[in-house]
Amino acid sequence: MSVHIEAKQGEIAETILLPGDPLRAKYIAETFLEDVVLFNQVRGMLGFTGTYKGEKVSVMGTGMGIPSISIYVNELIQSYDVKNLIRVGTMGGIQADVKVRDVVIAQAASTDSQINRNTFAGVDFAPVADFSLLKKAYDAGVEKGLSLKVGNVFSADRFYNDQLDKQQLADYGVLGIEMEAAALYTLAQKYGRRALAILTVSDHIFTGEETSAEERQTTFNDMIVVALEAAIK
């Protein structure tokens, strides 16, 4: 048991999927896993463990933003010795060829958060994905005939930020904007764990095209299958 997770030792798998929305965690568990057990509901942050193709896998919500995911990733690693952490979430696209509902694998994560600046005394640490997980996810997506995008994403510290120069990010090749990957990658590298963010484009920041809240909560199955296949390969 940790401060924010009530699971007993052994109830959380070495590999965990991390959606921001706890209701998406519930959807993933009920739709894709077998022999599901609820291990956490502290603060409504639902966590489940089950099996996928015979392999033990967990899934748990993290909430929104770098501070929230940092709490749960720290506790999952330090209190439960989780080895592989795969974020499955949404992002806003900013490239012309990144379409709504596309699946994006975040190779690296830039950020305007000051967390890493504080940690590294002003040094610009570059948070990157684990290559082995990235390759497994990419291969799984290609095998299923998906059109995947792989590249840099931007982990924003604020959801509403009129001052952020999104066009400049696009000009430098950033695929889209989300809010958690930079923290996930940094903590995984700190503790010697493997991490990856697989994201579905829920809206396009420049065109205004978007998906519904219900669709974000209960679909985006391509992303989830890619994550699960990467988790067990």
From Swiss-Prot:
EC code(s) of this entry: 2.4.2.1
GO molecular function, one term: purine-nucleoside phosphorylase activity
GO CC entries: cytosol
Gene3D superfamilies in the record: Nucleoside phosphorylase domain
PANTHER family per UniProt: FI09636P-RELATED, URIDINE PHOSPHORYLASE
HAMAP family: Pur_nucleosid_phosp
Subunit relationships: Homohexamer; trimer of homodimers.
Function: Catalyzes the reversible phosphorolytic breakdown of the N-glycosidic bond in the beta-(deoxy)ribonucleoside molecules, with the formation of the corresponding free purine bases and pentose-1-phosphate.
Protein name: Purine nucleoside phosphorylase DeoD-type
Natural source organism: Listeria welshimeri serovar 6b (strain ATCC 35897 / DSM 20650 / CCUG 15529 / CIP 8149 / NCTC 11857 / SLCC 5334 / V8)
UniProt gene name: deoD
